[in-house]
Amino acid sequence: PIVLVVSGIHAGEVEGKEGCLMLARDLLARGGSLGGDDILARLTLVIAPLFNPDGNDRIDPGNRRLHLPKLEGQLGPASGVGTRVNAAKINLNRDYMRHESVEMRLLQTRVCQAWQADLTIDNHATNGSVHRFSMTYDVPHTVESGRPEPIVYVRERLLPPVTEALKKNHGLDAGWYGNFVEDEAALEKGDVDPRAPVREGWMTYPHHPRFGSN
């Protein structure tokens, strides 16, 4: 199987960019703790570590400024982060169907079509918006998104123990990407309180094919 990892589509969401390079380093280190030789004998790993380089380099302290009532922004770094969009002001994570950007056209023709990956991992981070969980994750929600076997495997077998390990080893709470209903409703009033009790449930975004995660 071929696994494609795409990171850095939104500048400022740097965890995936750093993490996938660390993974590649550890896999290529002979005798590493990850058993790199064994893993790479069974799959091909294709990594696009920084899909939005122009946005990544447009660093400014005003980008992603923290604003809790609107559930947006992030804390630090003091020097600022890059922009969510590319140099042409296109949100690349809304361009998977249109192919308006040069970056997306090249990714599709030279990476996606060339490698025909069996599984794609799209690395984002929620430090551009405020959530109650320290870490969030997601899988496609529709049957049209791909084969059900990997979706069910990730949802039911892979992520539950990852969630438990994060809590046990690092004290971090993790959950599905989205927000609580109370938080979303309070956005219209501009008075979100992340400490308010949760009673009405949880909601997520519409899983349209223009998003890379679908």
What are these regions (language model features)?
Residues P1-N214:
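Structured catalytic-domain cores with a bias toward divalent-metal coordination
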